[in-house]
């Protein structure tokens, strides 16, 4: 999974920094990232959206100039997906196998208008769910911190649009706002490729990049005006709170997983010892398989 994440990130990086063959190198990296784990193509999509936001809000590029520069990213994303599909097709033919129906992987393709609407609703639901806001902003720490992070992204975006006079370039302003709003769609893009996809946490890595967007925006604020001081101070506080909460939460989760692991091993060893004491057990080299569940 980490290799797939790395390759998806590398695809965008190579497309950005290598002028001559960067797009082709990016296609190859993205194709292999999708080959390892399809869902992490969304990492590349969201990174491209972050770069578009940076172009308009921070670099203050004209709309048409940015479009000309960003066509290579579209080529990388489409080309990488096509290359992955070609390699997949060749592999299926070569080994005479078919794709399983798991997670809708065997039903990728164009969906109906109603299915796209359902995919959008599912996307917004899962986006709220992973941020702890399934039923709106709730009175617990994680939900409040994420709500504050989203609010700060919106406020800092407005502040930067005004400070950098991007609002005078209406197309650039609309494009930057649209890119921010499309981040959930980009992070859950697999929803729009098959109606049978069900997201789980491991597939939602791209959602974490919204915190990278907040960091990028905070770096543009200086400790000069009272507005920027308040926004930057609140942003640092929220990010520190999220880091602390997730560190504590992760340690609790891993502690419980470790306890569960040792409990499972202990039960398996106890069952194995009883099996070895049975008269039917003749050979110490017999293979024993322990399957089932316990309460």
Residue map of PLM features:
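Transmembrane alpha-helical segments
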Residues: 6-15, 28-32, 45-53, 153-158, ...
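Membrane-interface transmembrane helices that cradle and orient dolichyl/undecaprenyl
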Residues: 8-23, 55-61
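Signature aromatic-anchored transmembrane alpha helix within multi-pass, membrane-resident enzymes
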Residues: 23, 220-249
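Central hydrophobic cores of alpha-helical transmembrane segments
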Residues: 24-31, 175-180, 232-240
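Transmembrane catalytic cores of multi-pass membrane glycosyltransferases
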Residues: 31, 35-59, 63-205
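C-terminal transmembrane-bundle signature of multipass membrane proteins
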Residues: 112-119, 182-191, 207-222, 242-254, ...
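Membrane-embedded, lumen/periplasm-facing catalytic core of multi-pass transferases
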Residues: 242-295
């Amino acid at each position: 999974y980490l290799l797939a994440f790395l390759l998806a990130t590398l695809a965008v990086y190579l497309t950005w920094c290598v002028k001559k063959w960067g797009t082709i190198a990016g296609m190859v990296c993205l194709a292999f990232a999708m080959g390892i784990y399809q869902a992490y193509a969304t990492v590349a999509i969201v990174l491209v959206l972050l770069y578009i936001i940076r172009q308009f809000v921070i670099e203050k590029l004209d709309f048409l100039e940015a479009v000309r520069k960003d066509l290579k990213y579209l080529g990388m994303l489409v080309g990488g997906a096509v290359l992955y599909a070609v390699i997949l097709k060749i592999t299926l033919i070569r080994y005479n196998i078919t794709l399983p129906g798991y997670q809708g992987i065997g039903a990728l393709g164009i969906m109906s208008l109603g299915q796209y609407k359902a995919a959008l609703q599912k996307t917004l639901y899962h986006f709220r769910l992973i941020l702890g806001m399934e039923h709106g902003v709730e009175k617990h720490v994680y939900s409040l911190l994420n709500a504050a992070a989203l609010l700060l992204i919106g406020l800092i975006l407005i502040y930067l649009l005004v400070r950098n006079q991007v609002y005078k370039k209406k197309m650039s302003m609309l494009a930057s706002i649209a890119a921010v709003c499309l981040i959930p769609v980009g992070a859950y893009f697999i929803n729009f490729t098959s109606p049978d996809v069900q997201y789980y946490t491991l597939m939602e890595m791209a959602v974490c990049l919204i915190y990278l967007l907040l960091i990028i925006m905070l770096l543009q604020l200086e400790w000069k005006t009272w507005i920027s001081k308040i926004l930057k101070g609140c942003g640092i506080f929220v990010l520190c709170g999220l880091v602390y909460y997730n560190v504590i939460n992760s340690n609790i989760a891993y502690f419980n997983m470790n306890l569960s692991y040792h409990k499972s091993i202990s039960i398996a060893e106890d069952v194995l010892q009883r099996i070895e004491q049975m008269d039917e057990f003749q050979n110490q080299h017999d293979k024993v398989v322990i399957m089932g569940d316990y309460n």
